[in-house]
Amino acid sequence: MRECISVHVGQAGVQMGNTCWELYCLEHGIQPDGQMPSDKTIGGGDDSFTTFFCETGAGKHVPRAIFVDLEPTVIDEVRAGIYRQLFHPEQLITGKEDGANNYARGHYTIGKEIIDQVLDRIRKLADQCTGLQGFLCFHSFGGGTGSGFTSLLMERLSGDYGKKSKLEFSIYPAPQVSTAVVEPYNSILTTHTTLEHSDCAFMVDNEAIYDICRRNLDIERPTYTNLNRLISQIVSSITASLRFDGALNVDLTEFQTNLVPYPRIHFPLATYAPVISAEKAYHEQLSVAEITNSCFEPANQMVKCDPRHGKYMACCLLYRGDVVPKDVNAAIATIKTKRSIQFVDWCPTGFKVGINYQPPTVVAGGDLAKVQRIVCMLSNTTAIAEAWARLDHKFDLMYAKRAFVHWYVGEGMEEGEFSEAREDIAALEKDYEEVGLDSYEDEEEGEE
């Protein structure tokens, strides 16, 4: 089997983990204690869900996941929550003190005390796999643990499991909704460190998700649970093809092959449709064409940026539920006729399509309506450079005055790392700019 190990780091990662595993359990009919009444084969049957769950001799299903945080309170909620029997106690790893929103603490001082314990546990999980496919890492850019510890872990995983894919789901600091003043520092530092260790990173911007909750679900003041439920639907759509059999299945490595044209340009934009509340869904039947169209609306994106100002390099549509290829092809043909969607000229308008017949599941008592079909679009577009530009600008404002830098230096970092990281992200912006240029422009420049 092609197993995936999920690693949830820091508060954001752990809370995303909670909602994701809650949803996976519902989708596979696994109870909170790990029993699965529908599964008649005790012991490792050849089921698709074993990519994410391993089965014990007693017929219990245990997630192939690890939760790590440098302070215990968030993971204690898992230890006391309704899914406490689902996870192996050694898969929930906590430190004694906090990452304190400080990349240097997560990466150097506090992180290095706990990293070996985490890697041991990952090694045990990897040993249970017959054909480990790769790692999914969930974290935020802004927190100390999410930024610092994740980058340390990714470096070490590259060393231990060189050829395995590493995908990230990262919470990008929202332009308006900020949880820490030093988010820009942490984000730039972690991006710089993980850039060469990550194969593909799906960014999720809290503010974009807030807006979707407000606009589409009529939630006036969305809580983190509301946000995470929506994020978990997206993660579930991306991983559905690994967990269920479908007509057109997509493997982890297949994502990279189709979405990443150059190793550094590995930040696809995720869009999910339809996000609709139960009251409205009752009155609307959303066709394949409609949901496909709404994927190209900037309002449904997980990161605030405008693809109409950028160009698409690759596009991957993952459908789920009652969808047939004929409808999909018709929907794509309609989209290609629209001029607002521009592809780079060196990439013919290729859409990769995945179809999974498993209908979408929603959490009971949640905000999302149960619908017949959904689509999650992953597109690699040059517009995401806007997100880096915003972050760089904030970084520059603070770094010009060397504000807060002493906290990082005090934890054993060197100031040179800041400028090195900042230059790397500037280079990333430049890379995006160059990729978007038309190829004939490059040739003319070369001749002059």
Curated annotation (Swiss-Prot):
GO cellular component: cytoplasm; microtubule
Post-translational modification: Some glutamate residues at the C-terminus are polyglycylated, resulting in polyglycine chains on the gamma-carboxyl group. Glycylation is mainly limited to tubulin incorporated into axonemes (cilia and flagella) whereas glutamylation is prevalent in neuronal cells, centrioles, axonemes, and the mitotic spindle. Both modifications can coexist on the same protein on adjacent residues, and lowering polyglycylation levels increases polyglutamylation, and reciprocally. The precise function of polyglycylation is still unclear. Some glutamate residues at the C-terminus are polyglutamylated, resulting in polyglutamate chains on the gamma-carboxyl group. Polyglutamylation plays a key role in microtubule severing by spastin (SPAST). SPAST preferentially recognizes and acts on microtubules decorated with short polyglutamate tails: severing activity by SPAST increases as the number of glutamates per tubulin rises from one to eight, but decreases beyond this glutamylation threshold.
Binding site for Mg(2+): E71
Entry binding sites for GTP: Q11, E71, S140, G144, T145, T179, N206, N228
Cofactor: Mg(2+)
Subcellular location(s) per record: Cytoplasm, Cytoskeleton
SMART domains: Tubulin (SM00864), Tubulin_C (SM00865)
Catalyses which reaction(s): GTP + H2O = GDP + phosphate + H(+)
Keyword Nucleotide-binding: yes
N6-acetyllysine found at: K40
Domain of life (superkingdom): Eukaryota
InterPro entries reported in the protein's UniProt record: Alpha_tubulin, Tub_FtsZ_C, Tubulin, Tubulin/FtsZ-like_C, Tubulin/FtsZ_2-layer-sand-dom, Tubulin/FtsZ_GTPase_sf, Tubulin_C, Tubulin_CS
PROSITE patterns reported for this sequence: TUBULIN
Active site per database record: E254
Location of the motif MREC motif: 1-4
EC number(s) stated in the UniProt entry for this protein: 3.6.5.-
Keyword Transmembrane: no
UniProt keyword terms in alphabetical order: Acetylation, Cytoplasm, Cytoskeleton, GTP-binding, Hydrolase, Magnesium, Metal-binding, Microtubule, Nucleotide-binding
Subunit structure: Dimer of alpha and beta chains. A typical microtubule is a hollow water-filled tube with an outer diameter of 25 nm and an inner diameter of 15 nM. Alpha-beta heterodimers associate head-to-tail to form protofilaments running lengthwise along the microtubule wall with the beta-tubulin subunit facing the microtubule plus end conferring a structural polarity. Microtubules usually have 13 protofilaments but different protofilament numbers can be found in some organisms and specialized cells.
Additional information: This tubulin does not have a C-terminal tyrosine.
Family: Belongs to the tubulin family.
This protein's domain notes: The MREC motif may be critical for tubulin autoregulation.
Physiological role: Tubulin is the major constituent of microtubules, a cylinder consisting of laterally associated linear protofilaments composed of alpha- and beta-tubulin heterodimers. Microtubules grow by the addition of GTP-tubulin dimers to the microtubule end, where a stabilizing cap forms. Below the cap, tubulin dimers are in GDP-bound state, owing to GTPase activity of alpha-tubulin.
Protein name (database record): Tubulin alpha-5 chain
